[in-house]
Amino acid sequence: MLRPLLAAALLAVLALPVGASGSPIVPQLTATVTAKSITLVGADGKRVRVLQPNTYKIVVRDRTKAQNFHLVGPRVNRKTKIAAKTTRTWLLYLQPGSYSYLSDRNKGLSGAFIVAGSPPA
């Protein structure tokens, strides 16, 4: 009875994508905030519009003390401080749903994306 369970667990682990170091690959997104713009891009440099449910490494580059980066969505509510220039790295699981990112000081600086589909196998 234990053998089939162990075999299934081993297959699940082997099915995970891995990098050269042998650890699972975590997709990276980069958020950048300046005094006049806010963006969220994928590894390809293109603005994020649709993502699969997954764990993402989000590097937030807050380049101004005048704005901040605030990400809101299902079970997500993370932000940088307004009065600080900073670079932060967040490891977040993004589940299906609608997400928005904005500056709390200037609502005109905003963007949105959706997470849809099935998590990667």
What are these regions (language model features)?
Residues 43-46, 77:
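Surface-exposed, proline-enriched loop/turn segments that connect beta strands in immunoglobulin-like
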Residues 16-24:
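Bacterial Sec-dependent signal peptides at the C-terminal "C-region" and cleavage site
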Residues 7-17:
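Bacterial N-terminal signal peptides
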Residues 1-6:
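Bacterial N-terminal signal peptides that target proteins for export
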Residues 47-66, 89-103:
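Beta-strand cores of secreted/periplasmic/IMS beta-sandwich domains, seen most often
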Residues 68-75:
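Short, surface-exposed beta-strand/strand-loop-strand elements in extracellular ectodomains
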Residues 75-83:
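Solvent-exposed serine/threonine-rich low-complexity stretches and specific carbohydrate-binding patches
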Residues 23-42, 82-121:
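Extracellular/periplasmic metallocenter environments
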